[in-house]
Amino acid sequence: MPKYALYAKRMDPRLKEEAASTDTSQKGLKTMYEEVVRRMFHFIKGTCTNCGLPGHSFRGCSAPVTSFGTVIFRVNDLSWNQADVLTKNSSSYTGFESYIPKLEVLLIQRRDSLGFVEILRGKYNPLDIEYIKKQIQGMTDRERERLLTVPFDDLWSELWGVDSRTSAHYRNDKEISRQKLQILQGGIDINEGKISLESLIKECAVHWNTPEWGFPKGRRDPHENDLACALREMSEETGIKKENVIVIQNIEPLCETFYGSNHVHYCHKYYTVFVKSNLEVTYDDTNLHMKREIGNLQWFSLEDGLQKIRADNIEKREILVKMTTLLRSFCPILHE
């Protein structure tokens, strides 16, 4: 008997009367079952896409804004075999100790810096000069120049894509963002005189050639669990399929929690993932999702990876240190 029929037999007597005149095929019973569930749980709000718990929405969630991702590593040595190391070297507890210098981690570079996106989205108060300075400090030199020289419509379309031209939501945000940027470009009168976007950029002593480097991650889709979200983001941003990786089991995700320069509390949870050294990973500009999300991706040694992640991003640098410590002391058994 189909499970839908089983539930139909147990349902409320009032619904049985309705069922008497309905289609009793499997498709009809499925529809009936879904209606029963809808009526039984109509009082429960949807599941929060941020924390994964029922009873509230994202906007009503008190947990930090949470993303899920992966720290992807490999041993850049085709001759390395963990089983061989463990069986032939009695002093090895993990199979990694002598290969730590050959461990590499996959980092992705953001397409646009966080500060550039924050200013272009208009998520700031034009009178909050200190906050605006922080966003400018995080931009690349090229992004600063573009804010001064490229028409706003072009910047907006490049940031959001073609959907931004027709979406009412984007259209409303666009006009607010345009007005704020025009205020900044025109200059703001304060006690010390007039401050403009150009003057703030000129006095900035911090310079970056590329946007931030980090790990693939993203927000959870409705009804998606943590690991599924992390592996989906990995696939979308790096092109690596979940079938080609080994997720290290029996360890908690590596976490970074912090308050952003926008004063929002964030939490990023990363699963540790192993891939074979011969797996090709390249930036694919024909992959629209990859092109929209990232600017580059590359394998780095642990030391070079620490250098690539910006010094002020302490929490993300600690993720790499934690992973190195983990592989020195914990023995994940890798198998096909």
What are these regions (language model features)?
Residues 68-69, 103, 213, 269:
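Residue-level detector of short, conserved catalytic/binding motifs and their immediate flanks
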Residues 70, 75-150:
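Long, charge-rich boundary regions
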Residues 114-123, 133-138, 144-146, 150-336:
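Unchanged
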